[in-house]
């Protein structure tokens, strides 16, 4: 049965009618329907869940004459199953029993209390602690895109307005949302196809007036001018849809979402999707996290610090005042790293705990962790007090001390609370007098039972008599089978065992009712007091969020100070002059994974030396040299120290890489097509302040086509765009470029060849390489010896036919394309314009004489 089409529920049982009505409100997502200690799924949901979760598919009786497919999960294990579903991009509506079964006529009242979606989760068990979990919305009109992201676990709300498809693709790559909302008429489906968590939304949710109204209502403002987003209509359309979706799914107020920020391209270094992928910033080319820049740089001690560092890495800032401030802070903190990090580690993930507090889903252990974080603040304040740095003191001030909330939680919550409030024992003794009284009554049962047992033994003279309790039958008096015939007349039999009889007496029954009532009252009061704690803590929310942000930033900066010291990094110098000058530069990741010492190399790019043509053997280190330059620039522009002896760096607006390629089979694009698409993006968007890495342009096509393209690209970058360019190539003909244009220089990575073996020197030298060592590298890779031998024969043949094929000279026919374009011969022009079919024999003879004179 497909319940989405069956709107007539009258043939079904009352319980299934209730289920189907709730399911009709959430047709696209799974419905977890609470029945006692289980969440049940029925019909199509049950079939899907059994496949997604690998749980048994059973049947539950029949309704409307058909057996009902059913699958269920225990309520106490729901978080594990939700995590599995969310990781697969599924959303789930959680339906709880809100009525009392004892007083309900017919099915117990139920309602959907929350909707769990990949982009709106805040539960600790469902989130990866060191990664942001973003919900995003995308909007498109004739002028460009609107894009909004929200991290519900921190309240961070951002919007941007990418102007074109490439910029939009780069934003999707950078933010990597867990869930993406798009309009039902979204035109560029190819841009988002294959992404996880896609959600199609109706057009009206993106309506601009509704968006402004929703946002003003959320922030308690009359307009959005104060946020700097008033005129960002495309971005606001996306933000409005996103906020509406969050309200629909969370079904509670969102006090931690207090502002929205515009992300402008001119504020950060722009990197397209290919560049982020090629530089392996937070994800390697295989999709893992090993051997990435973040893996080397991230030794933060709090999850919120780790997430902030990754945001910095993906959005390097161009404001050198901010960068110099970060550098100064890192320098000032280097002497206190060993004292600060152990204390910061105890702060934990305050940012996400605060989000759960705002959503009123924080659990007792969240509040205990929050208390523990507050308890670290005095020591952090004391340690930072002596640091002579204005930025550090500003962070110290933002951290606050929160003595009042700390005192409240120390009084209210026991040291090691249980997981859930409903388990009881969360509120500390002494916090509330009435609660203590109910607990005393419930807990005083042991003393009473001991006294009752002694009294009844003496009264009856039965030495086997004892008083006990179990969860099924409650309190009882037990007498052995041998003495049971002596039980007094007022003993009412409650249970018969193999060797004993159990009884109840009116006094014990009355006490049992009182104890059970007191336990229930204690639990109800405890729940009420717990909810009141939220009301007492929430007025501090804005200051607490500021504190969490300051603590995360402190963690990042202390981490960068530790990394700089441990990895021997240096503080780069920013200059207004264009260019990059690096002394003894190293690749931050490669140097960590190598078993032998890394060979450091210099680099000098300036307006007078804008392009380096890099030649040398495969495996010689060309790609490493290029990538290390980009990574050093990237690290400098997050304010970090860098792996080099000395670095001076000028303004950079974009980093481009055209490094390596693979077929994009899903889009039907070959390696060469991918390569040319990325190259076109660079040639259209690079400026004189861009850093461009071009590796092996033109290798995916024929030699002459590839060489022609590589030459023309290099010429365009050096002469027209004037970008700072590293251009690696195996076309030795390109080493003649420095002779033909200004601002271009040759460098090479050397190797030594001895017989069939080759030693890579990995050091960068001025000038062009003498040869490519391709056969030696092939031998090293294990190509069979007979193939290498045949290749050497063929190479000698080719070199004898065209001595220039493997040399750096550019004479002869192969390099004619590099000479100035020749003027067309008059004789050729005349022949091209000639129509031989229209000539008489006499005219043909005259033409021969005329052509002879033109040659």
Curated annotation (Swiss-Prot):
This protein is involved in the repair of mismatches in DNA. It is possible that it carries out the mismatch recognition step. This protein has a weak ATPase activity. PROSITE patterns: DNA_MISMATCH_REPAIR_2. It holds the Pfam family MutS_III. SMART domains: MUTSac, MUTSd. This is DNA mismatch repair protein MutS. GO terms for cellular component: cytosol. The lineage of its organism: Bacteria, Pseudomonadati, Pseudomonadota, Gammaproteobacteria, Enterobacterales. Keywords: ATP-binding, DNA damage, DNA repair, DNA-binding, Nucleotide-binding. NCBIfam families: mutS1, PRK05399.1. ATP binds at residues 616-623. SUPFAM superfamilies: DNA repair protein MutS, domain I, DNA repair protein MutS, domain II, DNA repair protein MutS, domain III, P-loop containing nucleoside triphosphate hydrolases. It comes from the Bacteria. GO terms for molecular function: ATP binding; ATP-dependent DNA damage sensor activity; damaged DNA binding; mismatched DNA binding. Belongs to the DNA mismatch repair MutS family. GO terms for biological process: mismatch repair. It comes from Salmonella paratyphi C (strain RKS4594).
């Amino acid at each position: 049965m497909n319940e989405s089409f069956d709107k007539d529920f009258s043939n079904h049982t009352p319980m299934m009618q209730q289920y189907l009505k709730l399911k009709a409100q959430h047709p696209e997502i799974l419905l977890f329907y609470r029945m006692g200690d289980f969440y049940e799924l029925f019909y199509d949901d049950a079939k899907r869940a059994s496949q997604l979760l690998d749980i048994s598919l059973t049947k539950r009786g029949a309704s409307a004459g058909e057996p009902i497919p059913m699958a269920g999960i225990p309520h106490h294990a729901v978080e594990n199953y939700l995590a599995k579903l969310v990781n697969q991009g599924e959303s789930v509506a959680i339906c709880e029993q809100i009525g009392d079964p004892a007083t309900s006529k017919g099915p117990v009242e139920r309602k959907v209390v929350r909707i769990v979606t990949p982009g709106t989760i805040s539960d600790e068990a469902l989130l990866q602690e060191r990664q942001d979990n973003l919900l995003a919305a995308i909007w498109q009109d004739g002028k460009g895109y609107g894009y909004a992201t929200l991290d519900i676990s921190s309240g961070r709300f951002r919007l941007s307005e990418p102007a074109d498809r490439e910029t939009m693709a780069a934003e999707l790559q950078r933010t990597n949302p867990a869930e993406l909302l798009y309009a039902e008429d979204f035109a560029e489906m190819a841009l988002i196809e294959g992404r996880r968590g896609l959600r199609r939304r109706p057009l009206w949710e993106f309506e601009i007036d509704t968006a402004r109204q929703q946002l003003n209502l959320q922030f308690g403002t009359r307009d959005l001018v104060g946020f700097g987003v008033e005129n960002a209509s495309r971005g606001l359309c996306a933000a409005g849809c996103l906020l509406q979706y969050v309200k629909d799914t969370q079904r509670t107020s969102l006090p931690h979402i207090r502002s929205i920020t515009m992300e402008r391209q001119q504020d950060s270094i722009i990197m397209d999707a290919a560049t982020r992928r090629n530089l392996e910033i937070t994800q390697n080319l295989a999709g893992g996290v090993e051997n990435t820049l973040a893996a080397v740089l991230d030794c933060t001690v709090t999850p919120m610090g780790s997430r902030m560092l990754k945001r910095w890495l993906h959005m390097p800032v161009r404001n050198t005042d901010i960068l110099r401030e970060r550098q100064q802070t890192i320098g000032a903190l280097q002497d206190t790293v060993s004292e600060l990090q152990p204390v910061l580690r105890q702060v934990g993930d305050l940012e996400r705990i605060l989000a759960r507090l705002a959503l009123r889903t924080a659990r007792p252990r969240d509040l205990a962790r929050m208390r523990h974080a507050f308890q670290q603040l005095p020591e952090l304040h004391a340690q930072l007090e002596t640091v002579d740095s204005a930025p550090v003191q500003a962070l110290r001030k933002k951290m606050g001390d929160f003595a009042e909330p700390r005192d409240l939680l120390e009084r209210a919550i026991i040291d090691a609370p249980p997981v859930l409030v409903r388990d009881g024992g969360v509120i500390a003794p002494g916090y509330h007098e009435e609660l203590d009284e109910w607990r005393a009554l419930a807990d005083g049962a042991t003393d009473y039972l001991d006294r009752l047992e002694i009294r009844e033994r003496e009264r009856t003279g039965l030495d086997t008599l004892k008083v006990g309790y179990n969860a099924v039958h409650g309190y009882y008096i037990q007498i052995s089978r041998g003495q049971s015939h002596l039980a007094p007349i007022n003993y009412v039999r409650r249970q018969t065992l193999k060797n004993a009889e159990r009884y109840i007496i009116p006094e014990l029954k009355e006490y049992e009712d009182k104890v059970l009532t007191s336990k229930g009252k204690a639990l109800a009061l405890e729940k009420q007091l717990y909810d009141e704690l939220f009301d007492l803590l929430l007025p501090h929310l804005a200051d607490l969020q500021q504190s969490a942000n300051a603590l995360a930033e402190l963690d990042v900066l202390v981490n960068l100070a530790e990394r700089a010291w441990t990895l021997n990094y240096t503080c780069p110098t920013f200059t207004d002059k264009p260019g990059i000058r690096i002394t003894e530069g190293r690749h931050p990741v490669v140097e960590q994974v190598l078993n032998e010492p890394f060979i450091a190399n210099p680099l000098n790019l300036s307006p007078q030396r804008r392009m380096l043509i890099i030649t040398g053997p495969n495996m010689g280190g060309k790609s490493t040299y290029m990538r290390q330059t980009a990574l050093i620039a990237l690290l400098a522009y997050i304010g970090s120290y860098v792996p080099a002896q000395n670095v001076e760096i000028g303004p950079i607006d974009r980093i481009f890489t055209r490094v390596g390629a693979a077929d994009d089979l899903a889009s039907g694009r070959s390696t060469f097509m991918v390569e040319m698409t990325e190259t076109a993006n660079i040639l259209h968007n690079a400026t004189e302040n861009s850093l461009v890495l071009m590796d092996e342009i033109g290798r995916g096509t024929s030699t002459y086509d590839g060489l022609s393209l590589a030459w023309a690209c290099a010429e365009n970058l050096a002469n027209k765009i004037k970008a700072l360019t590293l251009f690696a190539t195996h076309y030795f003909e390109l080493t003649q470029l420095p002779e033909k244009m200004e601002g271009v220089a040759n460098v090479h990575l050397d190797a030594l060849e001895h017989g069939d073996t080759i030693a890579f020197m990995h050091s960068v030298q001025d000038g062009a390489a003498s040869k490519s060592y391709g056969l030696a590298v092939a031998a090293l890779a294990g190509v069979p010896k007979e193939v290498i031998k045949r290749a050497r024969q063929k190479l000698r043949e080719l070199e004898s036919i065209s001595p220039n094929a493997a040399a750096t000279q550019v004479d002869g026919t192969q390099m004619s394309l590099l000479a100035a374009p020749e003027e067309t011969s008059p004789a050729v022009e005349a022949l091209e314009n000639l129509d031989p079919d229209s000539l008489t024999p006499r005219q043909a003879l005259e033409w021969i004489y005329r052509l002879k004179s033109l040659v």
